[in-house]
């Protein structure tokens, strides 16, 4: 009998205020949907990447090398390494981008090192879109899947390499070079075509190793370097490959996670206000129930029953929304990495996320309903129940507005930062206009380029650098090899989180991850062996670098001229005002250098990531606008409901509805606009700290937002429009309050 009475009272409560009931369900649904979506996307991404890497048999350690290889030395080394279960040498023919055409699209402006390769014998397979090994026939080529949309490539289209023509037979997923953040891309051809095209490019070798379970790749890398085996190129490990694959879509998932947690916070603030308002509105009923002997526990259970069913309904709706949103947000991910085999794991994560969110809201509602214990029968019936003050209510509105604007700011600021030319300084790339790369062994090209640049009237500033694997020794005698770039680092400096760039011959700087690994910081000493001589250097600074595994060093050398163990040579250039960038690039490309516009390089590397962030940014603006509109309208309506008697008294005294509305709006606007300003400032400060934590793990220490003033102003205007519309709409409820209500009591 009691249960039936409770059920009828619960349904009556829902019908009494359908807007508040719907809003409560909406808050729960949004929280469950976003956190479940984050969990499912993360599960699908990691599952798909792991499945692709396992199917492709990605190497655990890869050494790129240009030059001769002594096979016997390699085999002798492998025999003495019990952790190696398999190894192979793959050939990669690096082609000039100017000689490549896909369909009618030239690859001249590509920022990638493009080349052709054949299928691996024992591992490192390039897979078709069905995750099977494609059969490549003579005259056919398989194109990296990331180029399908980028260059609008269709199966059956022609690919031209110089004067040779191949037919595009399909697309491949290359677990090793799939991400646009990898600087190279492999096209798959048959052995016969590879040999016939050999004279059109520069051949490099991929020396690859697979380890037994539990092997230490860092220990192997040190042993490989100490054995002085071929290492004229960067070394890459399996964790680095996985990180590059994860980073692009992982950035989007990180943004969704931050937004989800903030949406949960907004929902909890709103629910608190809704519950306290409801308790105040139904104080009379609570007093009557207590007066007739109903226990406080039963009254709490009665109230909680209403919200328990709403929580369950909201969770169900939220899971449904996450299922609908998951597919469109996974399209790019599935194209690059395939479908995750852990479908059940994704479902389990979604269910656990829903339980997690539901549990938090369940606990929160129970805590708020303890306020019912403070209501006595006497205070309720005499109308002396304490309610939220007007100031507290308006502070809640300010908080919600601040969080919503903060939500808008994070993806906008992240997008403007990643698309800014300054962001290259976190990647280990100098902040110039042009970057010129010279291949290994081309010291004469570097010298020639240096002479041309010094005499070029279009050049405002330039600097030459060369990178080599350099032996170093710490003060405690520990020896190792560092990937060290030599040159004048006072020109085109990177972002230094501690100290400054090396400016003298006895100074060196370390990347953040290398500094953390070795425990070396500014002021510490390091012995560097250059051209057969030991040089005792002082560490002057720690810089950001997310290239080459994030572990590099910078040595000051006025004029880099080392000839041994040089892995690559580069130059940074800033042009004079009015100089033709395209003309400059064409001139120096003809001199044997690979010349790229740094802005285009960033766009090519981070283009897919930027597109994902831009989509998320638009989605967040829409969601935040809706949150402000819904939440502020709800708050205003509840504030009016809690002040209904006072408003009625004012009307009875002769105040017009228009005057009361104006007064009400004026009292709300200062709090609301304060919330907008706080949200904008927090987006530039707290948002920066949140993104910095994520990028720090990749080697980007000292991350700072590059703010776009137009974007900030637009977000603030958008928030203001939503707030004004919400206050205007919500305050119209004052018109429905009659002057006589104060005489006959609240209806």
Predicted regions and their residues:
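Hydrophobic alpha-helical transmembrane segments of multi-pass inner-membrane transport and secretion
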Residues: 16-45, 247-287, 307-322, 353-356, ...
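Juxtamembrane/transmembrane-helix interface segments of polytopic membrane transporters
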Residues: 314, 318-334, 600, 607, ...
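Glycine/proline-centered hinge or cleavage motifs at structural transition points of membrane proteins
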Residues: 293, 299, 654, 659-660
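Juxtamembrane segments of multi-pass membrane proteins
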Residues: 62-64, 387-513, 522-524, 528, ...
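Short acidic amphipathic segments
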Residues: 75-90, 293, 452-465, 594, ...
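Feature of multi-pass inner-membrane transport and sensor proteins
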Residues: 1-23, 280-298, 324-408, 412, ...
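Membrane transport/envelope proteins' first extracytoplasmic loop
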Residues: 2-268, 277, 421, 425-435, ...
């Amino acid at each position: 009998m009691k249960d039936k009475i409770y059920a009828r009272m619960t349904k009556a409560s829902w019908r009494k205020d359908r807007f508040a009931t719907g809003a409560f369900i909406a808050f729960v649904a949004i929280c469950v949907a976003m956190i479940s979506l984050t969990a499912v996307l993360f599960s699908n991404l990691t599952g798909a990447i792991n499945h692709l890497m396992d199917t492709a048999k990605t190497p655990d350690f890869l050494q790129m090398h240009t030059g001769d290889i002594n096979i016997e030395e390699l085999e002798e080394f492998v025999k003495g390494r019990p952790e190696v279960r398999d190894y192979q040498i793959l050939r990669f023919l690096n082609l000039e981008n100017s000689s490549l055409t896909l369909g009618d699209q030239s690859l001249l402006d590509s920022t990638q090192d493009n080349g052709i390769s054949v299928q691996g014998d024992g591992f490192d397979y390039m897979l078709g879109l069905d995750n099977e090994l494609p059969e490549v026939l003579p005259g056919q080529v398989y194109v990296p899947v990331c180029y399908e949309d980028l260059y609008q490539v269709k199966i059956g289209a022609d690919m031209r390499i110089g004067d040779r023509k191949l037919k595009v037979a399909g697309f491949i997923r290359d677990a090793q070079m799939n991400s646009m953040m990898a600087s190279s891309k492999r096209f798959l051809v048959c052995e016969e075509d590879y040999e016939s095209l050999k004279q059109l490019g520069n051949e490099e070798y991929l020396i690859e190793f697979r380890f037994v379970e539990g092997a230490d790749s860092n220990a192997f890398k040190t042993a490989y370097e100490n054995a002085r085996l071929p290492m004229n190129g960067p070394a890459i490990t399996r964790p680095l490959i996985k990180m590059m694959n994860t980073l692009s879509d992982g950035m989007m998932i990180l943004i969704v996670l931050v937004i989800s947690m903030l949406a949960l916070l907004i929902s909890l603030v709103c629910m608190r206000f809704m519950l306290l308002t409801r308790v105040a509105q139904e104080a009379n009923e609570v007093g009557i129930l207590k007066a007739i002997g109903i226990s406080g526990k039963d009254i709490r259970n009665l109230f909680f029953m209403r919200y328990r069913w709403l929580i369950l309904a909201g969770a169900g709706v939220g899971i449904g929304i996450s299922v609908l949103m998951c597919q469109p947000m996974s399209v790019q991910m599935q194209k690059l990495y395939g479908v995750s085999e852990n479908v059940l794991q994704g479902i389990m994560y979604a269910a656990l996320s829903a339980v997690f969110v539901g549990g938090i809201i369940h606990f929160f509602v129970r805590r708020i309903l303890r306020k019912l214990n403070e209501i006595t029968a006497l205070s309720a019936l005499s109308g002396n129940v304490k309610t939220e003050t007007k100031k507290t209510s308006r502070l809640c509105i300010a908080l919600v507005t601040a969080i919503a604007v903060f939500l808008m700011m994070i993806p906008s600021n992240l997008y403007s930062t990643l698309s800014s030319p300054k962001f290259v300084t976190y990647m280990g790339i100098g902040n110039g206009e042009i970057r010129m790369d010279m291949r290994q062994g081309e010291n004469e090209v570097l010298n020639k380029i240096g002479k041309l640049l010094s005499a070029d009237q279009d050049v405002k500033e330039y600097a030459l650098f060369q990178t080599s694997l350099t032996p170093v020794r710490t003060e405690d005698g520990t020896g190792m090899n560092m990937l060290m770039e030599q040159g004048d680092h006072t020109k085109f400096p990177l972002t230094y989180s501690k100290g400054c760039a090396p400016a003298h011959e006895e100074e060196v700087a370390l990347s953040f991850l290398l500094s953390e690994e070795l425990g070396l910081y500014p002021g510490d000493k390091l012995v560097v062996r250059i051209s057969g001589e030991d040089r005792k250097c002082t560490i002057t600074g720690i810089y950001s670098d997310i290239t080459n595994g994030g572990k590099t060093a910078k040595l000051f050398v006025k004029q880099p001229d080392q000839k041994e163990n040089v892995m690559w040579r580069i130059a940074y250039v800033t042009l004079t005002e009015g100089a033709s960038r395209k003309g400059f690039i064409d001139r120096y490309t003809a001199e044997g250098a690979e010349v790229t516009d740094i802005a285009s390089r960033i766009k090519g590397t981070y283009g897919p990531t930027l597109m994902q962030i831009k989509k998320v940014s638009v989605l967040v603006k829409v969601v935040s606008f809706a949150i402000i509109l819904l939440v502020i309208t709800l708050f205003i309506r509840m504030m009016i409901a809690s002040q209904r008697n006072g408003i009625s008294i004012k009307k009875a005294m002769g105040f017009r509805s228009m005057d009361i509305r104006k007064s009400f709006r004026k009292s709300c606007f200062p709090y609301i606009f304060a919330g907008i300003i706080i949200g904008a400032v927090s987006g530039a400060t707290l948002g920066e700290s949140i993104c910095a934590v994520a990028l720090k793990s990749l080697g980007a220490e000292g991350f700072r937002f590059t703010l776009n003033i137009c974007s900030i102003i637009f977000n603030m205007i958008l928030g203001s429009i939503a707030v004004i519309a919400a206050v205007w709409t919500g305050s119209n409820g004052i018109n429905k309050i009659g002057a006589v209500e104060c005489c006959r009591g609240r209806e």
